[in-house]
Regions:
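Long amphipathic alpha-helical segments
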Residues: 75-101, 105-113, 123, 256-257, ...
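Short, intrinsically disordered, mixed-charge
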Residues: 128, 297-300, 368-371
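Extended, helix-rich architectural segments
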Residues: 1-220
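Structured, contiguous alpha/beta core segments that scaffold functional sites
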Residues: 10-21, 28-29, 154-328
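Generic detection of long, well-ordered alpha-helical segments
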Residues: 109-116, 129-133, 284-296, 356, ...
């Protein structure tokens, strides 16, 4: 864990306070720039991924989150697309990457090729041993729903990797002039006990004080990872590594801990991205959101209409001679013999088939946004030959070609580079 454990001594002098204040001011500007995205993400989460609906409002753990859902088409479609991309790009059952030398002359040397194959085998073993598969699936799901995923890669003790897909609500992104994300501010909460364990003797005075009072209280921490422009490249100390890693106590406005990374530890892929929008991407869930909201409203209305037909409102004479009315199964209601007054259901003239037909149209539009028909083509049919399987896979790859190209540049390539470099330092 070479890049993470070499730390500089924290200081409460004026320079570090000014640095902390400057970084927090930058965070404030990034928060303002992200406000419009948060409303959009909240809408998407409410209707398509309720378990992550914590942007403009938060709920306690275990709270019900499906109140707005009357139809689960979008939920299932998003899960299908994210699982399909997972299977195409980083399936645990296949070798999804190969290493090669940039120097073609080395590719012709058997000993060099054998060494590279050994490195590749070691990397696969580390990926399988780690939590990569569970975390990368969450990343793909974030891409499909929110348009932006954030994956953090660090070392796991002395050997191996550890991955963490971070909720986009915690992360504030900034790009370099080429449009690549090179700065991540993470604003999150952790218990005082966890903070004390993470920072040790370097913890701020507030953390040390709270540790004695209530170690289980949650506090806010800001973690900044950004390029270090003022470093001395000839030195290998943590304060001269290419990327700065700075933990800040935002309440006291002090730097708790400062270290560095040899590579950018975050992979921040975007599903689709407009050239004029900075930092964050757009998703098929955003494209389908109007249809999703309309379908939910249609389903709600259709359910109410069907309920009125199955258990219709009752028409009673205004003199109320039958009261009290018993509407339970087998209930007896008495009225005077010979009277023409009757207890009758109200005929509402509902047209449920039309409502169901319109719902199917919206479902088809949602499925089209998530490529459901193309991804499920041939599923449940007769057994396919190996050639047919390859042909179907290639068809899916062509369908998602533009998206997969962006993921290769923003996710897979930096991921492999980061993991390879971690192994070379161990």
């Amino acid at each position: 864990m070479a890049e993470e454990i070499i730390d500089v001594e924290p200081s409460l002098n004026e320079d570090t306070k000014k640095t902390a204040t400057k970084l927090l001011d930058r965070l404030a500007s990034l928060e303002v720039a992200r406000e419009s995205w948060e409303e959009h993400w909240q809408d998407v989460a409410d209707y398509i991924v309720p378990r992550k609906a914590d942007f403009t409002r938060t709920r306690s753990a275990g709270d019900k989150r499906m109140e707005k859902i009357y139809d689960g088409t979008a939920i299932h479609a998003s899960e299908l697309l994210s699982a399909s991309i997972h299977g195409m790009l980083t399936s645990a059952s296949t070798n999804w990457f190969n290493l090669c030398f940039m120097n073609n002359d080395l590719q012709a040397i058997d000993e060099a090729k054998e060494w590279l194959e050994g490195v590749e085998h070691t990397m696969y073993a580390q990926f399988h041993r780690s939590n990569f598969q569970e975390q990368i699936h969450e990343l793909y799901h974030d891409l499909i729903t929110f348009g932006t995923g954030v994956l953090y890669v660090e070392t796991d003790g002395e050997n191996g990797f550890r991955f963490e897909t971070r909720h986009i609500s915690e992360c504030f992104l900034a790009e370099d002039p080429e449009g690549r994300v090179d700065t991540v501010y993470r604003k999150y909460k952790m218990s005082v006990r966890s903070a004390q364990k993470l920072f040790g003797e370097e913890a701020s005075s507030r953390i040390n004080k709270l540790m004695k009072q209530d170690p289980h209280e949650e506090i806010e921490i800001v973690h900044v990872v950004m390029p270090r422009d003022d470093r001395d490249a000839e030195k290998i100390s943590s304060e001269n590594k290419p990327y700065a890693s700075i933990y800040i106590d935002p309440e006291e406005k002090v730097i708790i801990k400062e270290s560095g990374f040899d590579e950018f530890p975050y992979m921040c892929p975007r599903y689709l991205k407009a050239s004029f929008e900075r930092g964050y991407g757009r998703s098929p869930a955003m494209q389908a959101l109007p249809d999703v909201k309309m379908l939910n409203k249609m389903s709600e209305v259709t359910i109410r209409s069907a309920e009125k037909q199955v258990d219709p409102p009752l028409m009673l004479p205004d003199d109320g001679f039958m009261l009290p009315i018993r509407t339970v199964p087998g209930g007896l209601n008495f009225y005077r013999s010979g009277t023409r007054d009757r207890l009758e259901p109200l005929q509402i003239g509902a047209n449920n088939p039309l409502g169901l037909q319109m719902e199917d149209q919206r479902r088809q539009a949602i499925n089209s946004a998530f490529y459901v028909d193309q991804l499920t083509m041939g599923v449940g049919g007769p057994m396919m030959t190996a050639t047919e399987v390859v042909a179907r896979t290639e068809e899916k790859m062509r369908l998602l070609g533009p998206v997969l190209g962006r993921l290769q540049a923003e996710l897979l390539q930096p991921l492999i580079n980061r993991c390879y470099n971690i192994l070379t330092r161990q």
